[in-house]
Curated annotation (Swiss-Prot):
A GO term from the CC aspect: cytosol
Binding of Zn(2+), residues: 143, 146, 181, 184
Broad EC category: transferase
Enzyme Commission number(s) of this protein: 2.7.1.21
Molecular functions per Gene Ontology: ATP binding; thymidine kinase activity; zinc ion binding
PANTHER family: THYMIDINE KINASE (PTHR11441), THYMIDINE KINASE, CYTOSOLIC (PTHR11441:SF0)
Active-site residue list: 86 (proton acceptor)
Name recorded for this polypeptide: Thymidine kinase
Transmembrane as UniProt keyword: no
Keyword Nucleus: no
Length: 191
């Protein structure tokens, strides 16, 4: 029986590398995967997933008007698994489409993404994945500053000062965001 998985973690918890690993494992067994990513995330190039260790792979970009269910339903042969990167950027309707892929097409869907933003609020995609996923799995990493478990994301400005207000989405990497524990989120030891 297919299920909808939400594998969430802070930055640097290995979400993208895990997608690449899962895709490789399916393909090693001559099974097919459909890989999607947010069209918002243009750090490297729209339509690609890219890990911080340098591995990169093409993926179908998701925009506001993208119907993920229709795309997957029309793939021949039917994929054995659907993988999504940056799923925090999904909209509510996209999450419903993922559930429909699982329920109507009997294809497992594994969505990877951040749970909460730099203000420690849920992203829309994460909120609905937390509500609708059959299985929730935390991917762990350590705090940038103290090595406790990182559960939050700290945003810094161009001068390295912590930022706790502003637009939820600002695409960036390690130059503007850090995985942190709760204590270091509130009082980051930044010099």
């Amino acid at each position: 029986m297919a299920q909808l998985f939400f594998r969430y973690g802070s930055m640097n918890s290995g979400k993208t590398i895990e997608i690449l690993k899962v895709a490789h494992n399916y393909e090693e067994q001559n099974k097919t995967v459909a890989i999607f990513t947010s069209g918002i995330d243009d750090r490297d190039q729209v339509g690609f997933i890219s890990s911080r260790i340098g591995l990169k792979r093409e993926a179908t970009p998701i925009f506001s008007d993208t119907n993920i269910f229709e795309i997957v339903a029309n793939i021949k042969p039917k994929p054995n698994c659907v993988l999504l990167d940056e799923s925090q950027f999904l909209e509510k309707e996209h999450v419903f489409q993922l559930a429909k892929i699982v329920d109507d097409l009997n294809i497992p869907v594994i969505a990877y993404g951040l749970k909460n933003d730099f203000r420690n609020e849920l992203f829309e995609g994460s909120k609905y994945l937390l509500l609708y996923a059959d299985k929730l799995e935390e991917m762990k990493t350590i705090c940038w500053f103290c090595a406790k478990k990182a559960t939050m994301v700290l945003r810094v400005d161009d001068k390295g000062k912590p930022v706790y207000t502003g637009e939820q989405i600002m695409i960036g990497g390690n130059d503007h965001y850090y995985p942190v524990c709760r204590k270091c989120h509130a009082n980051p030891p930044i010099k």
